């Protein structure tokens, strides 16, 4: 029996259909019954737990009225209750949970559909795909029955603003109402166009903005621009070009550029490796500052992504004020992910230290890096070598002969001219301007060839190309290792058992359990060490637990 500590009674408890049980024996099961209240009472000089009966806060138990002193109370906490209700209402969700976009269709149509059917939302990973491929994915998602909430990613293309605008126009034409903007260092014209097109006042005079843009940022200076109204410069250009009406432009100052903002901490892919514990409070404070300054009728919700891989991480995010949580790396190892079994197996063996930063294909010349898996692949080292050569030499011919031989033998597996011809065909189809420039600028030609290796390394991975396994580029953050450690010995240990909804519900259910354990501890109740820390469960077992939800009395 756990004996009373300095905890003082907060009220009295009237016994229900069952007697309280000793805390050490009953509290872990009680915490799992998240749909039922937990009462911790003084019974014969020790703490005991019940999930029935009624409580009266502030009333002292006299001992002769059939009551027991109440020392702590934890209300029911269904996973549906986690997060910001405004976020869930705005997007038509049951849970404040987002399956974040991973490029090249890794966050696949199938994954987005599964998330939507479960009351969550997923963003299709459109980055790196042709507009026709993105349009096909949108068509499939819009044909889903029943209709589901879904979003699509718009990734920053600093060297190809025409692609950004083409995608924005396609989203508007297809009436895609939810778009995630990622890897942006500042707002661009296509983002403002997507956000503001169709803005109007309803019959009651309220501003209606049909297109919801969710920004994903790591830096406060970028967040400030996303949380502010679209810039007057962009609005003016859109009006002058006839893309916005003057009526739409007049309402531009009434809304922030983004409907919601994801604070992106130490994530896979594009990341600034920010610590979540400092990033999220900063972003929330910035939101509050700008919402007050601009008088928004509906301030943006701020969520957290990057490192969300265990129930404790999700619980911590919600406790810090996250309106929602966003997952990425851990979804890549789910059966619905648009990647290969080989990648899933590699990810399932990763530890938290098995990641590193490597040059990014889409922003190679700028020196931008992405976080990738380093275990089982030589991509990080080879990509770093290519960037070193690019910054050192003015053309491929200037690279010493022995190094060129090594590149053509180990990385290209063909001559430079053959590699260039393949690269040229790729860019002719996507960005002809790049080819024109490369034929005049040998350094740019070298950059495009090096970028070609970086770009194809990710498609080799998603396609499971066996002859290129040593070159796989697998976007991954330390969250993957944390998830693997948590899942060890559970139904989710093997990648073939990892399904998007099962992973999500384990995180949310576990977060609810962990949160209630924290509530009890904060009231002075000394819980057993493992209380509140659960292992992954079968989805059916979670649903069974969630079915136990009588209405409490207090």
Feature locations, PLM:
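Active-site entrance/lid segments in N-terminal catalytic domains of soluble metabolic enzymes
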Residues: 2-299, 312, 329-331, 458-554
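Catalytic or ion-translocation cores adjacent to nucleophile or general acid/base/metal-coordination motifs
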Residues: 131-135, 266, 312-371
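Phosphate/diphosphate-binding loops
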Residues: 160, 167, 171-182, 353-374
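Short secondary-structure transition/capping segments
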Residues: 171-179, 196-206, 231, 343-355, ...
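Helix-termini ("caps") and immediately adjacent flexible loops/tails
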Residues: 286, 336-341, 347-359, 367-394, ...
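Glycine-rich beta-strand-to-loop/alpha-helix junction loops that act as flexible
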Residues: 301-309, 327
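C-terminal catalytic or substrate-handling cores of phosphate/nucleotide-
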Residues: 374-443
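Glycine-rich phosphate/diphosphate-binding loops and the adjacent beta-loop-alpha structural elements
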Residues: 424-471
